Amino acid sequence: MKFYIILLFMIIAILSFSQTAPKLFMPKVFEGLPNIRDIAISPNNEEIYFTIDDYKYKIGVIACIQKQKNGWSKPKVVSFSGNFRDIEPAFSSDGNILYFSSNRPLDKDSTTIKDYDIWYVERNNSKSPWSSPKNLGKPINTTGDEFYPSITENGDIYFTSSREGTKGKEDIFVSRLKNNAYTKPESLSEGVNTANYEFNAYVSPKEDFIIFTSIRKGEGSGRGDLYISFKEKNKKWSKAILLETISSSALDYCPFVDIKNNKLYFTSSRSAIKNYYSKRLSYSDILRIYNEEPSGKSRLYTIPFVIENFKKQ
């Protein structure tokens, strides 16, 4: 009897782990591609935008897949991308503006790359084409780099920057949309930003929680882990909590939450390749383990995510 009780607990533990461990997202769709990162799902859940990055991070293109009757379409590079390094797409609340970061020049006739700015494209509806890219301009963009836009339902924009006024290295900033103009960006409170690196934040549409990556010695893997913070009654952010069930020894970043379907997506370069194999590897073995996922290539992962569970911690 004791044996069966122990066995029952083991089965429950295994099932519990299998339900909470991050899983590769659409591995067949991204098979054969180099690094895949970033994800933006349209508000109507019918489009998925992501970044295809080369191994040296020299060129990056934003691509999309669209929902069809029998699944999803094949990836297609969007109309406004393919010449420079375009990364980190993010939708507005109505799905008719797409923000992204790019090192493209301000002069459309130039081929000289610059620092990373936040750009955007517009459309009338999900069936209409995107406009030409427009630079978001000051006060958000500077002569330094601006990364990873995330937009609230009222149009405020959160992004990453190392500009003057940071609390450490890279910080997460917010700029409020007031009277159709953006306010001077402010570094988030100490619950989020520290003397370390904080970057690539997803903020919920209602701004009640934020998920971001930080590199903090003595916490997590130290290579970049996901943290969550909640907006408190005093409008400041609570002390960030490490998302331990998601963390790996690799860089985990670029979070996105599908609020409607309670799912968290993120990018990771985690690997299942071992540093020792008892059986000597053959050439075919090497090809197999290098092509199986996860193999250290940047890929998208997903995990069930119920925000109330984290509020209890």
Mark where each language-model region is.
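Bacterial Sec-dependent N-terminal signal peptides
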Residues: 1-21
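Short, conserved micro-motifs composed of acidic
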Residues: 19-313
